[in-house]
Amino acid sequence: MTRSCARPTPGLRWYDRAAHHATPARQGAAALALLAVLAVPALRHALESGMARHMLVQFPLLMLAGALLAGALPAAARQAVARWNAHGISGLVATALVLGLLMVPRVLDLALVNSAIELAKCSALVLVGAALRLSWRPAGLVVQGFFLGNVLPMTAVVGQLYVDTPTRVCNAYLLDDQALLGRWLVWLAMAIAVVWLAWMLYTMVRRDAALEASEMAAEPLATQRLE
C-alpha cells in the first residue's frame, strides 16, 4: 500500500516553503503558546521593567501572536473580514490609530498600574497583528506606501522627542531608558523604510520581467497565426 505525502515542490521560494509547513493549526498553536509565555508574570514584569523592552520586545511579540492567530482563521472568517477590509484600508487605518495611541507615554504608565488597561493594551496589540496579517497583501504597494508614509514618520518623530525631552515622559521609567527607546524608534523607522523600498523595487523589477517574458512568449504564437 503506497502512502502519498504532500511535499513542497523543489525550487519554491523560501516563503512558499514556509507557508506549506505553517498550517493553520500549527499557527494557531504557536500563537496560543506565545501568548501563554508572554502572560507569565515574571516574564511580563521583565519585559515591562524597561521602556525599550516594553515597546520594542513585548509589543512586536504580541503583534506576532495576533498575526499567527489570523493565519489560523478558516477561509469563511477571512472572507467575512475581507468584506469590510477592501484593499486592506480599514485594517491598516485601525493599526495606525492603535499604534499611535500606544505611543502616548501616559498609556504606558497606566498599563503598568491598571490591570484593565494592561489587558486592553495586550488585546489591542494582538488585534493589530491580526489586522496587519489580513491587510498587508490586499493593500498592494500604493496603500502600503501610504500607510508606512504616515506611521514611520510618526514613529521617528516620537522617538526624537523621547531623545530630546530633558524630563521623563513616563513616571515609571528612567530618562536614560527613555532616550534609548527614542534612538531605537528612529533607527527602526529608518530600517523599515529602507527594507520596504528595497522590496518595492524588487517587486516592480520582477513584475516588469514577468510581463516582458509573457510578451516575448506571445510573439511567436501571433506570428504563426498570421502565417
Task: Show the residue positions of the predicted features.
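Alpha-helical membrane segments of multi-pass proteins
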Residues: T2-E227
